[in-house]
Every structure is written in C-alpha cells, then in structure tokens.
Amino acid sequence: MSQSTTTTTTTTAAPAVPTGPREATLDAGNFCKRVKILYDSWNSDSNLWKSANSLVLALGQPNESNPYQKVTSLQTWLFGYELKDTIIVFLEKEIYIVSTSKKINLFQKLSETEQVKTELSSIKFNFLTIDKSDKNKSNFEKLIGEATKAGSNIGVIIKETYIGDLALQWEAALNECPLTKVDITPALSSCLLVKDLQEQKNIITSAKITSKVLKSHILPKIETIIDKGERQTHNQLADYAADIFESPEKISSKLTVEHVDYSYVPIIQSGGIYDLRASASSDDNPLHFGTIIVSCGARYKNYCSNIARTYIIDPTSDQKKNYAILLNVQSNVIKAIKPDVTFSSLYEKAIQTIKESSKPELVDHFPKNVGYGIGIEFQESLAVLNATNSRTLKAGMTLNIACGFQKISNPEGKDEKSKTYSLLISDTVLLNDEGKVEVLTDVGKKASDVVYMLGGEDDDDDNDNDPSVKLELPDDVKGITGRTIETKEKSKSVEERRRDHQKMLEQKNLQEAENKIKAMTDPNGKKGTPEVDYTAITKLQPIYSSVGAYPQDIVKNKMYIDPKKETVLFPIFGYMVPFHISTIKNISKSEEYIRVNFNTPTSYTQEQIDAGFVPPQLMYIREVTYKVNDPKVLANNIRLIKELKKKFTTRETEDREKRNLITQEKLILLRGKFPRLPEVHARPTLSGARRTIGILEAHENGIRFNPTSTKDRTPIDVLYKNIKHAIYQQADQESMAVIHFHLHDALMIGKKKTKDVQFYIEISEMSQSLDVSSRFNDEEEEERRERALKEKINNDFKTFIKRVEEIAPEPGLEFDVPYRELGFYGVPNVSTVFIQPSVHCLLSILEPPFFVLTLDDVEIACFERAIRSLKNFDLSFVFKDYNRPPIRISVIPRNYFETVKEWLDSFNIKFYQSERNYNWKRIMDTIKSDVKKFHDDGGWSFLDLEEEEEEEDSGDDDYHSNSDESESSDYISSMSSGSDDDDEDSSEGENWEDLEQKAERDDKMKTFDETNKRKRDEKSVSSSNRPSSSKSGSSSSGGGGGGGGSSRSKSSSSSSKGSSSSSSKSSSSKRK
C-alpha cells in the first residue's frame, strides 16, 4: 500500500503518549475491526451521517470539565488512547492524520502491520507532522483541499469545544473554508453502542470493581457511622469513596492507577433532599439515618459501569410496599431485555408493572426513563430508555437499568426529614452475544439486604400482612447497633407473630418436600433410589488359594489367628474355614464360651458396602459359639482377634479417608507484598505436635499457613473456593482471636482428615510473680494492658480479613461474625460449650471438637424435653438431606428457651416442640423407606406439641385410644424401644456382656420411682417393655440368644439385594 508522507525527519521513536504506557503500541486488530464498523455505517446510512463526504475528529487539549468528550471517546475506541494535538480526517479511501512526530511514529508503525495492510488494503494512510512555523497553514490547506475534492459536506462534532492552539487554529481554518459543516455526533455515537468481546470484558471488570467498592467500603463505612452515631456529611462520605477509586490497590492488588478511575464522584443522598438524575451531586448536609441513596460507578480502561442502592432504616409499611414494587419493576425491565426489542418497550414495561401493582399512583413519581446505554461514554445518548426511543436492542449492548420513585410523601415518618423520601435501584447489565441478559453488578438489593431495624424503636407501621413485602431479618445482619435487633407489630403479640411465621415456613417446607419427591421419582413413577446388588461386589480377594496354603502350624478343631492374612480360621464340622477379619462384627465370652457375630448384608453400613467388604455369596453365617475349656486359650484368642480387628479397622479408615480426599489445585502465590499474620497458632496441629505456630498468608486463590515451630514444615493450603464458611471471632469476651474455615471438602493435615481448619492468637500476658510485692494499681494496669493487646490483635485480624476479602476472586469471600447476644450454652459433642449463631451457621469454635452447623442445610429444628419443670432442654436439627443423621444439642439451660426460639424464627427455620426425646435414627430410617408416604401422612406435623395438646383438650377427660391415633403415631412410636419386629431382631446376635447388662437394667427398673424426675442415660440401650427417652437399639442388628454347645452356628439366606433380618431368621440353616 502506497503512502504519501509530508513529514519532517523523524528521530528515534519516543513511544509514550501522555496518557498511555511508556512503550505504547496501538492494537492493530481492534483498529481494523472498528474502522470497518465506522466505514460500514458511513456507507450504509447517509441519512444518519447527514450526507457527509468527509469526517473529522479533532482534539487539541482535552476538556477537563467534561471527561466524556465525544472526540476522546472515539479516539479511545479506535486506538485505545486519548491522543492530544491530533486531527484525523476520514475520506472515502484515505485517512489523513495530523499530529506530533512521536504520535506519527506510532501511526506509521500501525499502518505498516500486516493485519492493517491486509484488512484495510483499500485505505491509504497519509501522515502530516505539526508545523508550528506557519501555524499549520500548509497542513490545513492540504486537509481542506482533499475534503473539498470529496464533496461539499464535512462531518464534524458541532457542540465540541475546541481547546489548545492546534484545535483553535483548525477551527479558524474550517470556518473560513467553503465546506458545509454537518453534525455527525449521533452517527459516531451509533458506532459505540454494540460492544465487542474485549469491550464486554472491560465493562464486566468495571462492574466488579463498582460492586466491590460499594459492598466492601462504602456500605461498611455507612454502617459504622450509624453504629457509632457519628456525624458525617454527604460530601465527606463521597470523598471517602472517591479515595478508594484513586487507590485501586485497596480494591484489589491486581489493579493499577493507570486503568482504574471513577465514572463520577460517588453520590450520597439522605434527609429528604434527593435527585435521581445521573448529574446529581452530594451536598454538605449530614447523613440522616432514614432513607439513604448511594450511587457510584467505576471506569476500567475507560469503560464505565454504574450501581445505585437505597438503604432504609426503620421503614414504614408504605416504604416497604413501595420498595417491593420498585424491585419488581426493575426485575421485569431486565427480563424484557432481548435482541430486537425497542428501547421504548422497556420503559412501557416499567409503567405497566407499576399500573398493575397495588399502588398505581406511583406512576406519577417515576422518572422519564429507566436507564441508558453505558460503555466508553457514561451515558450513550442514542440508547436512552424512554417512551420515545424507537431504536432496537442488539446483542453486545450494555445498559444501566435505573428505576426509582422520587419525592414520595411519608406522613408517618419519624422526623421532619423522613416526611419525604425517594427510592433508586440501578444495575449495569449486558445483553450477551447469545441474546441472554447478564446483571454485572453484584450487590444485594432484596429487602433483607437493604432494610435495617434499629432495636428498641417502635414501628407503628409494621402491621402489614402482605407477604410480598414482609420485612425479614437481613441476611447479612451487620449489627447496626449493639442492641438486639427486633421488629414489633402493633396489632400482634410476639408469640402470635412467631406462630404465623412458623405456619408460613411449614407451607414452604411442604412445597420443598413436593419438589424433593418429584426429583426422587423417575417419569415412570418409580423411586430413583438405587438398590444395592451384593452379587456384583467382588472386591475381596481370595484369602488362600487352596487348603494347602493354610498355615503349617494349624491344629485341627482349634481356632487359629493368621495376622499376615488378617484371617481367623474357625473349625466347623471338622473343617478349618477361613474368615477375613472384616467379616467379624464382634466377639465376646461368657465363662467357658466364646461367641463370634459376623457381618451380614443387613448389618453392613453403606460405607462398608461401597468399600467392597460384602462377600458375593448368598449364604451367610450370622453367629458361631464355641466351648473352650482352657480359660487362658479363650482369653488369648479373644485378645488376638480384637487386636487384629482394631489394626485392620484403623488402616481401612485411614485408607478410606485418603480415597475420599478431593485433589486440590495448586496455590497461586502472590509476588511482592501480600497480607500476612505472624505468630499464629493452627488447629489441627501438625504431626501430633502440642502446638503449631507459623505465619498465615493470603495469596491469589487461597490461604497458606507456613509452620515455624515444628519439624514438619509442610504448609497448610486452604483454597478460597473450598471454604464453605469463613468465620471471624474477635477477642472481646474471649481470650483469643480466631479465624476459622469450615470447608466443602476435607483436607488431610498430618494424619488427620478434617473439614475444620482454625488459626488463632491467644491473649496471654506474662503472669505476675507471686513472690514479688505488687503495687496498689498493678491489677488495674494489667487490665489496661490486656485491653490494649486485645485491641491490637483485633485490628491486625480485621486488617488481614479485609485484605483477604479484597484479594478473593468473585463472588468473593465474606467472613461471618457470631452474634454473641444470641448465644447459649449446650452440649453438641461431649462437653458444655457456648454456641453462637452467625449469618450462615451455628457454631462453637473456641475449643475442639469444633461444631459448625450450616443453617441453609437445616429443614426443621425440634425442641425436646420442652417441659417447664425441667431446668434444661435439648434441640435437634434435621437436615434437608435425609441421609445425613440429625444433630442434637443437649442440656441447654431453660432460660435460653425463648432466645433460641426467636433466632430460629428470625433465620426462617421451622421448629417444633416436644416433651420427649426422639430416636432420630429410627425416625429417619422410617422416613427414608417411603418419603412420599411420610409427607402424605402429614410430614413433620407429628412433632407438633401444640397440635397434640389441642387434640387432647378437645377430647374427653379420660384417655381413649383409637385406630386414628395409632396411625398418627407411626413416627412417634420410633422414640420408644421399637416395634415387635425390632425386638425380635435385637434378640439375635447380642453378645453376652450386652445380655447381662440388659438383665441388670431390667432388675433396676422394677424399683424405679415413677415420681422422680426422669434421668437420661446416654449409654443405655432401650428396653423392649417401656418407652425410652434416649437412643434405642444400640446393639447391632444381630442380637440375643446364644447358648452352650461345643460348636453352634446360625446362618441366614440373604438375597442379593439385602433381605430384612426377619427373613434372615426364618431361613436359618447350617453352612455346609
């Protein structure tokens, strides 16, 4: 391609333009693609381009008061940079560029690339260097002469203000020439509407930055101001937010000042004076704790994004209704965004939604548009979403969807500034190349995210019964005040409100249960639960290849233990029969008898089945009893078998844990300075050490703990994506500051598999020596030092956590902080601990064993032993996954009863009350056997103590049993010792020790005083003759019996799919 260049001699290229990097290069690919878009539009739509024969982009010095000049936007779009002192003239087949020698050098390199030569071969490039000697007269004559040859109309940006010598000289020359100037501003804007993939990526990143600033900086700042009752003006808050954009390392360590800026100075509004226009600004009025509107937007590589949220403190019922309607309006507008839909139809959708709502009069308070296009320009003038814009949406467009109500009267406001308020919600969205809409800004906007209730303040307006606008406890309760957060309803007592909410939760659970049943059933109506085919399990290898491979020192008719093969050989009818140790369930003795119980398919756990420990044969020996005259031999055999079983079980447990481990991806280390906490303790400890001390570091995709106090220096890596719950408990009333991670997938730390990893620092000052005389105020001084130390450690932890949340990739990592005021004492494991709820879980993390219960996994909670005369009660949690065993927290002091009920209700957990303890294992087994029947029979309603009481009250004074009651108590019966079948089951396979203990308990029960308070024995096995309040059926599925005889055995024929124990008993036979 030929070039005509009238330029002065060029020295070595100085590659920097003022706003670009030092070694600036122009992207040939983007340039070619976007020049084609410009020429295609110019050639195809002469009306849009006003029949212009040539086009001009002229920039002298940028207008600092207008960061979104049209010419700079076009320069950025074409070349990636703002190019000062540059004039570009586009002709039909030529492009003329006038600029400084340094920039000309860049343009020449661009024009000489193979891509430009190939894709823009029809266009000739001409470069003219600025000539100050004649004030560019010759250059301008050349440009105007070529433009005149092309035609009489020259396209310019009419309203652009020219600044700088070059631009003013060009303006004068253009005014003196005979060419007719036509305005091509709309045509140039049309080129910017549809974004390519690179532009979309920039806007997505910009939206993430915007979301991070609001979520992690502006909102916490506002909450702190409200919490402490500080006085700060809107402008002070706006300046604080602007400083975050100007220091992008506070947002993410990957961001740089060159690429990040704010789209506009953030806007904070409150106190009755609101402006919903994009041109609004903050004022010097103090922040009012009523309705607060926050707007902010980031600019990443010159591409803009925007977000706005309204936060409401102590709203009236009207405010809640209006906000719910506004949410619905924005949701419907976003759903209506599709290719080839007109901009005006989106506005019409918003108006329609308001008119169809319960408050159609809000139309009068709705703005004249629902947003606009956004990209390099913050507001794309051709893409305003109003009632008159007939342009259509195209894939690749990005929009700022802004919906609001302005100047709404609020006569019930708590003060004069609350009498008028406005609402605004705004999000940046993308209509992607697949024609689907994506919301790019990610900050909560549900009522539970934006509504705050200051405790202790009456809300006379909370008598609204509309479930669509029901005020919920915010999901991310930040503790705006140190007081208990509460909502009061004037027309209802607390108990009535709670009861109504519980009924609503019950209906919600029923709906979820229906969905669960549908998911478990295939289209043919068959259950989706797979059956286990025992005949297909062949993982156990043959122990001995033949009888000749038996050990040489074996003695006929004597039991033999072979540790090498992990096998016990039993004499049966004169033959030595080998049994792998995994087939032996337990072994016991009584006087001169030794009794062995075997595992059979009905007594194997699912893990054992999955591990392949179920033999494929269909005939199984369930028990065998031998008479051994020598007590020493008997004791030695039992000892050897138990030791072998323990060794095997330990090894298999470790192997199974290792098999189940998920392989983690590698930790990506950050270079340079990264967040770290020194002298931190870790739990679990490494290699059995008493303490493990080291350095906690935050990196790109996870946390690393580098131990410094142990011989084992293997680091502990926790990836962000593997963290289910991140918990921070500060050293307030506790003696340690703790960062605790509850994981999705377990880690192997040392030889221990764990889902809970903890890092902490103990607050331990040097104790005062008792043999040294103390000063009068030593104790006070020590308390002061401890408080100062706690404050320092808390600040260090908070700084580290804040940096971790900034580094963690989207959707980000947020730390839960427990609510101490909602805590209570209980026994979740083996000892009494203080248990606290947080936003997402119930936890006790100060001492191992740790307890972390995910509240989202809970279906119901059940209060057990909820009797006023008792000093404590129990609380059980049943999970949505019925395969998970329920968890019980025992011995909770009675004075916490109302507190626990209140927070369970606030966290939307349905609870029941009962005067007894349930055998949850039996209940869950019954439910899992037929989930559909369980829910058809009323589901969890059998746990409802209040309903039971109502039924009892409605009947006669005397108790009358009936068939209906027996049917309704199908599941309640599970708390007793079990059905007759279960009793028969438990009479087989019990060892002698169990039988003796059972007999002793039966004797004691005869003298049991019915007037005494019921005592709970956690280790007791339920009796078959009385209801039990503790776990029943602790003995194995084999049970009872056993007699004398030198060699007796019971066997059962079990189907390949696992017959019930009753069928096993009926088909007893001897193994041949």
Swiss-Prot record:
Keywords noted in UniProt: Chromosome, Coiled coil, DNA damage, DNA repair, DNA replication, Nucleus, Transcription, Transcription regulation
Binding partners and assembly: Forms a stable heterodimer with ssrp1. The spt16-ssrp1 dimer associates with a HMG box DNA-binding domain protein, probably nhp6, to form the FACT complex.
Bias type Gly residues, positions: 1036-1046
GO molecular function: nucleosome binding
Species annotation: Dictyostelium discoideum
GO biological-process terms attached to the record: DNA repair; DNA replication; regulation of chromatin organization; transcription elongation by RNA polymerase II
Pfam family, one: Peptidase_M24
Coiled-coil region list: 486-522
Protein name: FACT complex subunit SPT16
Ranges of compositional bias, category Acidic residues: 946-956, 979-994
Native organism taxonomy: Eukaryota, Amoebozoa, Evosea, Eumycetozoa, Dictyostelia
Bias type Low complexity, positions: 1-12, 969-978, 1021-1035, 1047-1072
Annotated compartments: Nucleus; Chromosome
Family the entry assigns: Belongs to the peptidase M24 family. SPT16 subfamily.
